[in-house]
Amino acid sequence: MTSMTLKNPLAGLLAAICLAGCGALPDKPARAALYDFGPGLAAPAAPAASATGSAPRALPMIALAEVDANSRLDGTQLLYRLGYADANELRPYGQSRWSQPPAQLLRQRLREGLSAGHTVLGPEESATIARTEGRLPDSLRVTLEEFSQYFESPGRSVGLVRVSATLTRNQPGGDRVLAQRTFTARQPAPTADGPGGVKALAAASDAVVAELVAWVDQAR
């Protein structure tokens, strides 16, 4: 009887210790929210047929290289700058990330924009054209130079995107530069946080893409 009396309080004490230990375990770290530029632009229209009703007119080809970026923009971190404190320092959000590096997201948008009026080729497709037809299409090379949420004050920020672009044409003597330009876009963020920065950077990227596509058409 005495042993039974001692055993029950001991079992209760052990159970209490276990419950206390479980309650003291750290919570699982919150998973970072992943973002991209949204579902994309409207699908490009089909090539228009000729006046005689024959097959649709073939779109001009353009080779789109991979978008380059400096080492600061190689990762998937969502970056911001405090312009009112130290604009030279890039800071990452802790719980907000891009689903892919910004250069890849930008290239997807650029390909969508160009495909409305061009047959867009990647590096491998361009190489195939060169082997089979003995020619290379004009080539567009883009470098992403700035991609951050820029805080002008604690409560006001913009999405800041800057790219440099070079359009070249392959010739027997080597590539000839047709045009070269830098594009910059700033779009206001609806909120002074990571999700607001995502919306602003997506809008600024779309603005840069629209301007770049129009420039390509004019330069050719």
Q: What feature does the model see in each segment?
A:
Residues 18-21:
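C-terminal motif of bacterial Sec signal peptides marking the signal peptidase cleavage site
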Residues 88-97, 171-213:
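Short secondary-structure boundary motifs at beta->alpha junctions and helix caps
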Residues 111, 115-119, 149, 213-220:
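Sec-exported extracytoplasmic/periplasmic mature domains
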